């Protein structure tokens, strides 16, 4: 189901997926309502972070694999533990066997190595490090299992009624699900409850020893006003993103789930944000619908995998396409050689015996 409040053309162009990763800040204005683009894939939501007012919603209650967007609630619980004095940002935490066993994206530190809670939080958000998520979970709750119980309790407390978590980092698990609306509620809670930690979400890079780790969110380097939040990707979910941006005292947040490429993910989020910033008079045009008052979609779907649509070497589609291109090139070369041989035969002088 698609909700688009006060749809109105404001004159300019959409963000190009190929340009969204450029280092220069983009000055783009969106011409047509984002709702009109048939190529857009999964659920999406655009809302005001101050009051939860919805500017655009599409399939907002469909369950989706959150992938590394899971790390937003992981960070939320770590912030809570720091606030409550249970741990400090300066505390050293160790790499356990479980943390060390986590697949990329990860820091890859050896078992027994230590880093601060602060560094682990940076790695969680910037690098999207799966091992850092487990380290933090163990530091806060003693084990990942106990931490997951806290995640689900927090989700219930925050009104994330269609979300369920089984791990702290978002690695593939059939039962790990959320929705665009639930992730929006989580984002509002993070911004509201921990304004002193907003710098974590806005950091473009971090240093760990001699390594420089860059943020996976290209909008931080390409879209004017971007100040967070988090990317996510597994093959079954496609490319996910929660992106926040602030201009002229307004903070808008876009939730994008299930794009087939990273570029499309960034472009869709940028277009949604630009739509929100460029549409004038939105407070009166869009009515009073908010995350809490917008009705639950009657046709809300359970989670599905979009693996076959995702363009990524990790999911096999990139490899299959590369093989197909190689076969096409081989056929083209063979056809060209055959054609050249045929032309040469026609030009050859006739001979008699």
Where are these regions (language model features)?
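Active-site-adjacent loops and short helices of periplasmic peptidoglycan-processing enzymes
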Residues: 2, 31-181, 188-191
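Sec-dependent signal peptide recognition
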Residues: 23-28
